[in-house]
């Protein structure tokens, strides 16, 4: 399977698992400007490459990258 199709399938799965309004808690983030572990937030949308765009409760808006970052789902929509 080519990389584009793999990313497309992953993004579709993430869009189903984490619809807008889903609450998540960050465990760890692989980013130099990471949101602190334990921060909670609300999913705004999942883009076409599978990044989960968040509104964090601390005011940040940094997206999660599911294959690199660790987080847990708190609520379903």
Model-flagged regions — what are they?
Residues 2-77:
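Basic/aromatic-rich interaction segments and small domains that mediate binding to polyanionic partners
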């Amino acid at each position: 399977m080519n990389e584009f199709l793999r990313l497309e399938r992953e993004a579709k799965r993430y869009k189903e698992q984490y619809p807008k309004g889903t609450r998540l808690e960050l465990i760890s983030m692989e980013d130099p400007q990471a949101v602190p572990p334990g921060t909670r937030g609300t999913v705004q949308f999942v883009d076409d490459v599978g990044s989960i765009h968040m509104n964090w409760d601390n005011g940040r808006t940094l997206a999660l990258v599911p294959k690199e970052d660790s987080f847990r789902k708190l609520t379903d929509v």
